[in-house]
Amino acid sequence: MVDDLGFSDIGCYGGEIETPQLDKLAANGLRFSQFYNTAKCHSSRVSLLTGQYCIAAGDVALTHAVTSAEVLKEAGYFTAMTGKWHLDKEPTDFGFERYFGHLSGACNFFTGDNTFRLNGEKWQVPEKDFYTTVADVDFALKFLKEAREVSKPFYLYVAFNAPHAPLHALPDDYAKYKGRYDQGWDKMRDARIAKLKKLGVLPKDLQESPRPPHIRAWDKLVAWQRDYEINRMVTLAAMIDRVDQEIGRLVDDLRKNNELDNTIILFVSDNGACPFDRKNPLLDAKPTNAQTSFGDSTGWAWARNAPFQFYKQNQFEGGISTPGIIHWPKGLKTKPGEISDTPAHLIDVLPTLADFGKAMIPTEHPSRKLRPVSGISLRPILEAKPLVRKEPIYLQFAKDYGLRNGDWKLVSFKGQQWELYNLANDRAENVDLADKEPERLQAMVEKWREMSQTVLQSEKLANAVMKPAEVPKSNREWTVFSDSDKPPRNKAKSRGKKKKK
């Protein structure tokens, strides 16, 4: 799992960033055009690990759930994890026999933080020659070796914290992308959409969402704003490129040990690209060291989530749509490179792993009051058969709500009045049909409230009061540039919370 990746960031999903390792996995595996996450870091991790919606599972405490590590460990698997945890306690408290990484939601890529752990013990980050994306795979390879030494099948969960802010890149990766983003976000987004259609990930007649009012046209930015934004995208691209390189090291290790063809590899992101601009601008800066970093960019987040609208946290397609790649040559019955248009969700991962791993998902636990798993096994899709989902896919983070039922999507921005879209011919959610389909709207709202009560067991959500629509939609943490903005005075020395423009 990667962190804050845009839907179109990687090559096989339309991106210009060089991701040959992921592209090869996709070419020899299966891609999903409609794989969903929860639009937020910790809640997606809960769903990935438990097969439940976050609140149903007991949120970060996991008080009503078991994890995939616990399930597969019981079935005889060697269980290991590296990277970002972002939940309560530690991975070693939830079935992982080996763990390296940080318990926090984000950290400096070069110096880490004080939450790093190795197998339940505090781990001191080295003073030099450290970068989290690389370290995650260093330890992943070590854990795979340990699994082989005890002759056990393995379950490895690698949770990269890239490309989550702070935006930090290794010098060589950063240098590779200098000069590649001078054209700006409008042209990059157009190119990505064209490539997505050419690849067949999206239909050729799809109408993309327009540039929203809070995103300035690239040619309307002043020179220093363009320079600053170019630098941010160069850094993001470098971070994503590095993730791909490290995935390549994992794949090479599996191949060397004759395990690649019979290993299920799943690649997903926890949410869409992040728009929250929480740092003052820096000019003439290279974020290739611990002292210099950038915050996220709303403009690039819009382009990176192409062709959709909105972002991390929002339950619109831009927030919840993730690349979804499965590589398993010995198990997949689909054609190499095939694309499935069947909707899937992170809640389906645990049931799928338990199904193929011949493991039982328990209904009782000595210290937790378990609730039913909401996800279903994706075996039919992997075997080139239709998938039947009896219940809609429930969508929620904080006050962003939604429901996916067949081709229809109910969605609310920050608890504002409900909107309704037919994704069969409007995946980018351009035409709100709430007024034209009042009965369908009401039925879906009632179903969302019912699931809030019966599945999540949340009275608060079930009785949520919707607010009037805000036009245009806004967020105080989105980047807002104006012609009157002055260049930062201190350039690379600028620090602190982003000031409201």
Residue ranges and their predicted role:
Residues 1-418, 423-446, 459-460, 471-501:
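Formylglycine-dependent sulfatase
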Residues 465-470:
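Long, compositionally biased
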